[in-house]
Amino acid sequence: MKCKLLCKLKGLFGIYTPGCEYWVDLKDIDIPIDFLRHHPRQEKMEQKWAYYRQTGEFESPILLNRNFELVDGYTSYIIAKTENLHKLPVYFVD
């Protein structure tokens, strides 16, 4: 509980601790060109969609670097964008 509160407070000041979950605006996430050039396989997307429909959660976490560039979780990003979600749970990595 103490860690979650500390992470939220740091997030208010733009300080993001790796390993803590934060909610960010979809529009603030930058997608590197490599992700845009290579679309996920259809089977992979179908699996990710099935999981999302069953649980309401992403199967893969969305990982960002400190510049808000996507590091991993592109399939979850695609689902969020398709569903017109505005805020997403993300984790920051070094």
Give the ranges of each region predicted by the language model.
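Short, charged/polar connector segments at secondary-structure boundaries
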Residues: 1-94
